[in-house]
Every structure is written in structure tokens, then in C-alpha cells.
From Swiss-Prot:
Domain of life: Eukaryota
Annotated organism of origin: Mus musculus
EC identifiers of the protein: 1.14.14.26, 1.14.14.29
Compartments it resides in: Endoplasmic reticulum membrane; Microsome membrane
Named cofactor requirement(s): heme
Gene Ontology molecular functions: 24S-hydroxycholesterol 7-alpha-hydroxylase activity; 25-hydroxycholesterol 7-alpha-hydroxylase activity; heme binding; iron ion binding
The protein, known as: Cytochrome P450 7B1
Tissue note: Highly expressed in brain structures including the corpus callosum, the anterior commissure and fornix. The hippocampal expression is particularly prominent in the dentate gyrus. Expressed in liver and kidney. The hepatic expression is sexually dimorphic, predominantly detected in male liver while barely detectable in females. Expressed in lymph nodes and spleens, in both lymphoid and stromal compartments. Higher expression is detected in fibroblastic reticular cells, a type of stromal cells in the lymph nodes.
Keyword Iron part of the UniProt annotation: yes
GN (gene name): Cyp7b1
Recorded catalytic activity of this chain's protein: 25-hydroxycholesterol + reduced [NADPH--hemoprotein reductase] + O2 = 7alpha,25-dihydroxycholesterol + oxidized [NADPH--hemoprotein reductase] + H2O + H(+); (25R)-cholest-5-ene-3beta,26-diol + reduced [NADPH--hemoprotein reductase] + O2 = (25R)-cholest-5-en-3beta,7alpha,26-triol + oxidized [NADPH--hemoprotein reductase] + H2O + H(+); (24S)-hydroxycholesterol + reduced [NADPH--hemoprotein reductase] + O2 = (24S)-7alpha-dihydroxycholesterol + oxidized [NADPH--hemoprotein reductase] + H2O + H(+); (24S)-25-epoxycholesterol + reduced [NADPH--hemoprotein reductase] + O2 = (24S,25)-epoxy-7alpha-hydroxycholesterol + oxidized [NADPH--hemoprotein reductase] + H2O + H(+)
Amino acid sequence: MQGATTLDAASPGPLALLGLLFAATLLLSALFLLTRRTRRPREPPLIKGWLPYLGMALKFFKDPLTFLKTLQRQHGDTFTVFLVGKYITFVLNPFQYQYVTKNPKQLSFQKFSSRLSAKAFSVKKLLTDDDLNEDVHRAYLLLQGKPLDALLETMIQEVKELFESQLLKITDWNTERIFAFCGSLVFEITFATLYGKILAGNKKQIISELRDDFFKFDDMFPYLVSDIPIQLLRNEESMQKKIIKCLTSEKVAQMQGQSKIVQERQDLLKRYYRHDDPEIGAHHLGFLWASLANTIPAMFWAMYYILRHPEAMEALRDEIDSFLQSTGQKKGPGISVHFTREQLDSLVCLESTILEVLRLCSYSSIIREVQEDMNLSLESKSFSLRKGDFVALFPPLIHNDPEIFDAPKEFRFDRFIEDGKKKSTFFKGGKKLKTYVMPFGLGTSKCPGRYFAVNEMKLLLIMLLTYFDLEIIDRKPIGLNHSRMFLGIQHPDSAVSFRYKAKSWRS
């Protein structure tokens, strides 16, 4: 995109992150004692490793699927692993997930997420104010239903404006890295849709600097959510504070055309904070990060797989063309096509493609913190858990299970289509799975912005496939960078370039 700075998918590698974590352990002399824990009666099998603090982290981050499958064969579906200073009990049987997600009193997501927000975004009040927590989560309802329809209408207008002012003017082949292109595109559309327009005379410079600072912050994010003391993360803390200053209550109020959810968040935060409290900006940073951090890499992977699979691109373009013809819409110079949420949902091939992309690249985990010593009943077995430990469900094992998905490593755009409709029936061990793709979490931790994110991906893919010629340049296969393990959509482990130009329309 014009005006976009170079953005690579070069997130900190797992070994670099673990190296810094290991250095931090030198400051904590008692950490070695943590590895001396022994298994008590009725507790799950315990896998500690020999490295102080790190435990089994090196093997886990190198190849998490193989690591967990190996332990599953050795110890069964439930076991505890010592990882980076934490004891995490994995429950790998998908038919037992409900026993973890439906016990919020003893297995809490809220306290875990509040601590994460305190360190990653400097939102401290959520740790102690349950009323604020409830009000913040209640506001997320404005990302569903009719408010979501209004957001989609705004998004369409923002896409139209951005494409017509910049991208449609590119009539000769232009080469960019896919991740950089997707990052700039998703950032600008998302920010304008949610926060409105910056009215200052130097608005292009302001949004460009905010975008670049956000990308730097996001690259640092795995460090921020680690156990490394914030005092050792001076660059990360400095970037965090810089963005917070750009999103103060006063500066957000000066933006024109804010979405209803941003207005609601502004109003409710004023009830809990002074008008000039910097923590209001910290809340906005957390909300902005949640709106972008997984959509950008998901959009990258969607473009990457579609460009590498001509049959997918052809099927998607055929579906879009058929829809436009059925609704009397015509393609031509300028953005003239329009979609409602119901119409986007009706595009079965597009829905299947996005689900397949999320299945392949999502490594999110459902995490709960044990609030008290307890017994976790899993059908015929019961395990003792200790206060302060964590319980994790790991959906990538389902996503990559050959019993559930034939050839799970392959990209198949039509995997979720059956007889021209969405396929929703998948089995394991002869039993139907209630949920078979879980990129957005489960239960109380399910991403509230999932519909917004998927609709944005659908809309952008439609516009790119309709109005542009697209070709991949780097045809080498790439893999996943696992430095964001547990955090959602993984980044690629290397850069990939493509070229594009606006289609020429004959009158």
C-alpha cells in the first residue's frame, strides 16, 4: 500500500524469547526450587524436564503438536507439564472440554486475563474492580447483532474510500510483502471503523506513526506477557506508554465518527477514572490490540493460501460473481458492490476458505487458573489440582487430527462444504464433535470480536479478488513461527512477496 512502511512477520523467535526468559531467572534465586515438585496421589502425570524454570519449554516451542501427541501416547489425555515457571495441566480429550469451561468459580479465566492486561497494556484496575470488569465485557455486546450491522456499513465505506484513494490507482504491477500489505490494510480499515477519523491537519502522519508504533508493540508482545519483569523490558514499556498517550480520553473524543462500542467504552471508563487518567488510554490500547493482533496474520494466511491455490481463487471469484449477478450488482471502475452481513454469511465457499485458514494457523489455547485446591472430574476419572496451577485445552490437536480432518496438513478451501452447504458434522472415535474448529476460544474466554474480524476478512478478500489481479511471487512453502504460542494466530516464519494491480474495466 502507498505510504506504508515495511512490516515483516519477523516476530521474536521462540529461542530468542526463551533466552531472555532464562536470563531473567538469574535474578530469581528461588526458581530452581520450583522444579523439585513431586507428583502427589491422584494428581495427573507430571512432566517437569531438567531445566530450572524453563522445564519442557524448549521441546514444546520447537514442535508443540509432536510434543503433546508424544506425551498423550505415554500418559493419556490428561497430564501436567512444567513450562516457563508454570505447571499447566493439559486436557486433550475434546469430549471433556466442558468440565473445564463450565467451572468458572474454581477454574477462572478472569483473574488470569486481568493480570495479563495489567502487564501487557498497563490496565491495573481490572485486577481489583469486578464492576468495571463486568461493564467492559457487557460493552462487547455492541460487536454483535444490529450494532455489528452498523459497523459493517461503516467498514464498507472505509474500504471504498481507502481503495479508491490509493489502491485502485495502482494500474501497473506493484510488488509488496503480503504481511506488510495486510498489516497496513487491516490497521487502517479497523482503526477508522472503530475510532473514526482523525481531524488534525497532519492526520496522515499521525495515523502512519500510530500504525508503525502499534506494529513495534505487537512484535514485542510475547515478551510483555511473559514472566520477565517489566523493569527489564524498557523498550517494550516505552512503546506501550507512547501508544497510550495517543489514545487518551481527550484524543479519542476528538476523533470524528466513533463507533457505538468506542463511545460506550469512553462513557463507562469516565465513570471509573478521572478524565485525564492515562489508564483510559491503556484500555483503548488493549481494545485496539485485540481488534488487530489476530486479524492481521489471519488475513495474511488467507491471502497466502488463496494465491498459492489457483483452484481456490477461481472458486471464490466464481462465487462472488454469481452473487453479484443474482443481486443485480455490476463490477466496474470504483467500488460499487455492497454486502449485508446476511449476504456475507451466504457465501459458502468464502466461509469454508476462512475456516480452513483458521484451522491451519490458529494456535490459541483455552487457559484457566486454578483458584483453590480441587478435584477435576473428567467422566470416569478425577484428578487433584493445586491452587495457582493452570489448566489448558489445546484445540490445535483437534485441528490437526487425521481422524477428524483428512490430510490435516493440506489446505483445502472446500473442506467445510458438503452438498453446496456448510459442513458442520465431524467425528472422533465415532462420536460427533460439538465444536471442531476453535480459533476464538471457548466459553467465557471466547473472543467477543470474532464476528467483526471474520466479516472484515470476508469483505477485504471480496474486494481484492474482485478489483485486482493478484499473483504470488515467492512460491516456496513457509511455516509457522511459534513465538506466539497460546496467543492465537501464528505469524509466518519467513516473508512472502506478491504483486497486484487494479483490473482494467472496458466500457
